[in-house]
UniProtKB/Swiss-Prot annotation:
<keyword id="KW-0963">Cytoplasm</keyword>
<dbReference type="InterPro" id="IPR036409">
    <property type="entry name" value="Aldolase_II/adducin_N_sf"/>
</dbReference>
<keyword id="KW-0206">Cytoskeleton</keyword>
<dbReference type="InterPro" id="IPR051017">
    <property type="entry name" value="Aldolase-II_Adducin_sf"/>
</dbReference>
<keyword id="KW-0472">Membrane</keyword>
<dbReference type="Pfam" id="PF00596">
    <property type="entry name" value="Aldolase_II"/>
</dbReference>
<dbReference type="GO" id="GO:0014069">
    <property type="term" value="C:postsynaptic density"/>
</dbReference>
<dbReference type="GO" id="GO:0005737">
    <property type="term" value="C:cytoplasm"/>
</dbReference>
<comment type="function">
    <text>Membrane-cytoskeleton-associated protein that promotes the assembly of the spectrin-actin network.</text>
</comment>
<protein>
    <recommendedName>
        <fullName>Adducin-related protein 2</fullName>
    </recommendedName>
</protein>
<comment type="similarity">
    <text>Belongs to the aldolase class II family. Adducin subfamily.</text>
</comment>
<dbReference type="InterPro" id="IPR001303">
    <property type="entry name" value="Aldolase_II/adducin_N"/>
</dbReference>
<dbReference type="GO" id="GO:0005886">
    <property type="term" value="C:plasma membrane"/>
</dbReference>
<dbReference type="GO" id="GO:0005856">
    <property type="term" value="C:cytoskeleton"/>
</dbReference>
<keyword id="KW-1003">Cell membrane</keyword>
<dbReference type="GO" id="GO:0051015">
    <property type="term" value="F:actin filament binding"/>
</dbReference>
<keyword id="KW-0009">Actin-binding</keyword>
């Protein structure tokens, strides 16, 4: 099931001030000894904000304390007095959600900026001109992913600890699933994986076509269509759903709302969007701005046009890249045809930190391609946006890694909503969204996540012994987690399993699939990826069949010493001024700068600022 903060498929940017009181009072019932609004289906942010505003004037809808348990129906909305603080709101019989260091739920928080217009309606805003923040805390019980709880709080920016409207506690429960017991252990143990798969309808090896299409359609229906004219005001866009979606919503639930009078103001703030019909293949087209013809100046000269011999070599390399590596130690093989990486200008409207991240992430995609680790348009790498921890940058699904540039990267939040569609007409890989959103949400300290299918790592992932500490590179990588293969990663319910299996490690091997690397920076992620691949290539040459009878294993003290030393900047061995002075370099930064110098020398225009 989706654990996004809401389903904004019917959001046109106009927020009505009041929901019909008659509509709400007809759905008022008693659940868990509390007043509850029983709705046939979960709503979107528009509707929830309207309920909060209406409840402000009708105290008979408001509870003085949160419920202890849900009633396990499709959608239950508990309105709670605005005087109840945020710490009290999340307490129920399934709390505490964290006991000691054990994570008992998958949790995430989302923040949306608004301002109040002259008609008293909330309209979306950017951080610079917003006056209010809608805080949404999403919690999914690990032992029962069918149970979803969201807490909605509207606060003013200047007093974020004080609610300005009644809060909402929304429980949604998918019928047909077993009702969880209060305080049931939420850790998904391996011995219960078969039961979890049965509950979630996850086949053992692959997904049925109907199930896969349903998941894809649900994901793509949540994606906003990007306006072609949003180059100067990227944060100002609206979402219009297809007519079929609107008809369906009107049949299921009809909020009786007064006509919005501030339409003219809304039209000035939010541009109209051209809606494209969704095809049965679940593909989506995102209207984007054209690729900027401007690039950042480079101090290096662009390489000359390649001759015919080089072109033939590149064609061969393109088809073999990432499939078979003949090098003992991976080394970049540079292409004669070069697309500049840093193709955005400083005045394109991006935050300087995000612009640097875009250049770095695009450079990492190029390095992965040049190392011959890529597989066409597949696999994915993400980085958390420094200005908003709930947003990540990812490649456009349809581009080769040799085509990725700063402008083509897509910015998406952890709910799957596209914030900036980049310079292409491509969308986001659903498997990439499921994997990366889970890790970025479960591990807030992780900044960069790399997922690749390198053949050597896949070979080790298929060995029962897993990664062995038989090379220095494997010791540098450190402790590794393992995730069992359950088919292509398109089911969002598998995110809790991914977070559990990763734990606090930086590397996770996906059985019969590939690997995931988590870095505290882009540079760190590349360094870990590099050493993991070398370690796996060494292992499949040493123990191709997994027989370790004739293998020498180093002492545990040596293994720990290698990891401790290598975990420092400069690999822990950078000697300067008569002593080891590695701390001036962050993890992976020393070799990253070397790669950037080489890329710029070849004319890739990385936009890198040398240290």
């Amino acid at each position: 099931m989706s654990d996004g903060s809401d389903d904004d498929t019917n959001n046109d940017g106009n927020y009505c001030k009041n929901v019909s009181y008659n509509f709400l009072i007809q759905r008022l019932a008693e659940v868990s000894n509390r007043k509850c609004l029983l709705l046939p289906k979960k709503k979107n942010r528009v509707d929830y904000i309207s309920i909060m505003q209406t409840a402000e004037f009708y105290p008979e809808l408001v509870n003085s304390s949160p419920p202890l348990e849900p009633g396990f129906t499709s959608c239950e909305v508990f309105v709670v007095d605005k005087k109840v603080d945020k710490d009290t709101l999340h307490l129920d019989n399934f709390s505490p959600y964290h006991i000691g260091a054990t994570r008992r739920t998958l949790e995430r928080q989302h923040s949306y900026f608004y301002r109040v217009n002259e008609s008293g309606n909330f309209v979306p805003a950017i951080k610079t001109n917003g006056t209010h923040i809608l805080r949404i805390l999403v919690s999914i019980l690990g032992s029962c992913p069918a149970l979803n709880r969201k807490i909605y709080r509207m606060v003013k920016i200047e007093s974020q600890n004080k609610n300005c409207l009644p809060s909402l506690i929304v429980y949604t429960f998918e019928p047909g699933h077993e009702i969880p017991k209060p305080n049931a252990p939420a850790i998904l143990r391996r011995q219960t994986s078969d039961e979890i798969q049965k509950i979630l309808n996850i086949p053992g090896t692959s997904f049925s076509q109907a199930h896969s299409e349903a998941v894809l359609n649900r994901f793509y229906d949540d994606l906003p269509i990007r306006d072609e004219a949003s180059d100067q005001k990227r944060a100002r866009y609206s979402i219009e759903s297809t007519s079929s979606t609107n008809n369906q919503l009107n049949e299921i639930n009809s909020f009786v709302v007064p006509k919005f009078e501030g339409r003219q103001e809304s039209e000035q703030l939010f541009r109209d969007v051209k809606v494209e019909q969704f095809e049965e293949s679940a593909e989506i087209s995102i209207n984007n701005r054209a690729l900027s013809p401007h690039i950042q100046p480079s101090k290096t000269s662009v390489v000359n046009r390649p001759n015919q011999q080089n072109r033939k070599f590149q064609n061969y390399d393109m088809f073999s890249a990432g499939v078979i590596s003949t090098a003992t130690v991976p080394a970049p093989m540079f292409h004669p045809h070069i697309t500049p990486i840093a193709d955005l200008k400083d005045d394109d409207g991006y935050d300087p930190e995000e612009l640097t991240q875009r250049n770095k992430l695009a450079s990492l995609y190029r390095l992965v391609d040049l190392f011959r680790w890529s597989q066409g348009i597949y696999n994915h790498i993400t980085v958390r946006v420094s200005t908003d921890p709930d947003e990540i940058l990812i490649n456009a699904f349809g581009q080769l890694y040799s085509e990725v540039s700063a402008s083509s990267l897509i910015k998406v939040d952890l709910d799957g909503t596209v914030i900036d569609g980049g310079s292409t007409n491509f969308g986001v890989n659903q498997a990439g969204y499921v994997l990366h959103s889970a890790i970025h949400n479960g591990r807030p300290e992780v900044k960069c996540v790399v997922h690749l299918h390198h053949p050597s790592v896949v070979a080790v992932s298929a060995q029962k012994c897993g990664l062995l500490p038989i090379s220095q590179e494997s010791m540098i990588v450190g402790d590794v987690g393992y995730h069992e293969y359950r088919g292509i990663l398109i089911d969002e319910a598998e995110r809790a399993l991914l977070v559990r299996d990763l734990g606090d490690r930086n590397v996770m091997i996906l059985r019969n699939h590939g690997f995931v690397v988590c870095g505290e920076s882009i540079e760190h992620a590349l360094s870990l990826t590099y050493h993991l691949i070398i370690a796996c290539e060494t292992q499949i040459r040493t123990v191709p069949g997994g027989n370790t009878d004739n293998v020498h294993f180093p002492a545990q003290s040596a293994i720990k010493q290698v990891y401790k030393v290598a975990s420092q900047g400069g690999g822990g061995v950078n000697r300067q001024n008569g002593h080891v002075n590695s701390m001036q370099w962050k993890k992976g930064e020393l070799e990253w700068q070397a790669y950037m110098r080489q890329l710029d020398a070849q004319g890739y225009v990385t936009g890198n600022v040398p240290n």
